[in-house]
Swiss-Prot record:
Protein known as: Flagellar biosynthesis protein FlhF
Natural source organism: Treponema pallidum (strain Nichols)
NCBIfam families: FlhF
GO cellular component: plasma membrane
UniProt keyword Transport, yes or no: yes
A molecular function GO annotation: GTP binding
Taxonomic classification: Bacteria, Pseudomonadati, Spirochaetota, Spirochaetia, Spirochaetales
Domain of life of the native organism: Bacteria
Gene3D superfamilies xref list: Flagellar FlhF biosynthesis protein, N domain, P-loop containing nucleotide triphosphate hydrolases
Single Gene Ontology BP annotation: protein transport
Sequence positions that bind GTP: 224-231, 308-312, 368-371
Subcellular location field: Cell membrane
Keyword S-adenosyl-L-methionine: no
Length: 437
């Protein structure tokens, strides 16, 4: 029987977790309140540690040792067979813990040798033996925190690993709490188990969405903050459907491009240059009513319509609202809206982008500039909270070759320090990972 520990913010929660894992087969030995420091002492958290053992089968707990459970029962009558009673007590204690078993084994052997000697005596002798055993158990229990601190190095290691990958504080905090809640103490001792569990949660945080199959005209609209690369990304998408895809299918789709970006210097010129290279028409609209006119016209003569929008800061609520007017003008059309975000953005900034651009009812994300970031933790942290799927990822400036279908493995390739990463990336998540439709 092993000495185990459960950690929780309160004693009640710790006991609840113990009961959930082990049922009624537990024996609580000791409770300790601790102040633990995180992030190099900047944050302190109060926790309660409960040390306990688990009874299996017919094994007894410390509370089942004769005269510990009820001393009055022992003191009610004289003991006729002292050594037999000692053996019973010692064997009960032996099943609590391996360390205790090691210390009481010589006492059991000595008692068995004297078992034939029956000397009537008072219960005080048995009571003294019980007190000795209780002291032994308490001493071993008191030494447990040193062992536990070493065993919980796995928690400290995974916390540091997540920090090095730029995961947000909230993601790290939730992951550590979830580890302690869902894994047994035995599993927490193994860093390999801890790492594989956290890696699985990271994978589960990434949701992939396959582009829809449409029978009519597809109206693909890109929205997003300034500087994330919407115009270049839209050119890559247009080139994929107009140049790359026909080589595979043998079918040449009809493609049109519209831009509403009249404010950024050179934006329309940049898109016009891309269209000239691909032999596509570009329409620059100045107002929502003009946008409606061209969208209506293109529904009859085009297979795919791409719409580039002006980039605005997520805190520029006034101009974002003005952009919404364009969308209201075409509210009767089925729009395929994608929010374009920079892979290197901070988690807090991404949360704000998700919040402000929710007005556009985007269906999925396009993650840009994956090649320009060294850490992916901020992105995954934000994705785990928003649960917004990804459809495309860009990995460079080349049109159209640096546009890729979103995949779990592509994002995992940016993680650093996970020894089990190669094994996970060897799993077949398909072209789109965990698909959502």
């Amino acid at each position: 029987m092993e000495l185990l520990v459960e950690v929780a913010p309160t004693k009640e929660k710790a006991i609840e977790k113990i009961r959930k894992k082990y049922g009624d087969r537990v024996n609580i030995l000791r409770t300790q309140r601790n102040n633990r420091s995180f992030f190099f002492g900047l944050i302190e958290r109060v926790s309660v540690e409960i040390f306990f053992s688990v009874n299996s089968g017919s094994q007894s707990s410390v509370h089942e040792i004769p005269s510990v459970q009820s001393r009055t029962r022992v003191s009610a009558a004289r003991v006729e067979d002292t050594e037999a009673e000692k053996i019973k007590i010692l064997e009960s204690a032996q099943r609590i813990n391996a360390k205790i078993a090691q210390q009481v084994e010589p006492l059991i052997s000595a008692a068995k040798e004297k078992k034939t000697e029956k000397v009537p005596t008072s219960p005080e002798a048995v009571h003294a033996l019980t007190q000795t055993l209780e002291g032994m158990i308490q001493k071993i229990t008191n030494s447990a925190p040193v062992v536990i601190a070493q065993e919980l190095q796995s928690i400290q290691r995974i916390e540091l690993l997540l920090e090095e990958n730029d995961f947000s504080f909230s993601f790290i905090r939730k992951s550590i709490a979830r580890l302690k809640d869902e894994l047994s103490y035995h599993d927490l001792e193994s860093f390999e188990k801890v790492e594989s569990t956290v890696l699985r949660w990271i994978i589960e945080s990434v949701h992939i969405q396959v582009p829809p199959i449409c029978t009519g005209t597809r109206n693909i609209v890109l929205v997003g903050p300034t500087g994330v690369g919407k115009t270049t990304t839209l050119a890559k998408l247009a080139a994929f459907y107009f140049v790359t895809e026909p080589k595979r299918t043998g079918i040449q789709p009809r493609v049109k491009i519209i831009t509403t970006d009249n404010f950024r210097i050179g934006a329309a010129f940049q898109m016009e240059r891309y269209c000239e290279l691909m032999g596509l028409d570009l329409c620059v609209v100045q107002a929502p009513v003009e946008f409606l006119t061209y969208m209506t016209l293109y529904q009859q003569e085009t297979d795919v319509v791409f719409v580039d929008t002006e980039g605005r800061s997520p805190v520029d609520g006034q101009n974002i609202e003005r952009m919404v007017e364009y969308f209201r003008a075409v509210k009767n059309f089925e729009l395929e809206v994608y929010l374009t975000i920079d892979a290197g953005s901070k988690a807090n900034d991404l949360r704000e982008v998700f919040k402000q651009y929710a007005l556009f009812e985007y269906r999925a994300l396009i993650v840009t500039k994956l090649d320009e970031t060294t850490s992916i933790g901020n992105l995954i942290s934000a994705l785990s909270e928003a649960r917004t799927p990804i459809t495309y990822i860009t990995t460079g400036q080349t049109v159209p070759s640096n546009l890729e279908k979103a995949s779990v493995n592509l994002l995992l390739s940016k993680l650093k320090g996970f020894k089990l990463l190669a094994e996970e990336m060897g799993n077949d998540y398909g072209d789109y990972g965990s698909k959502e439709r």
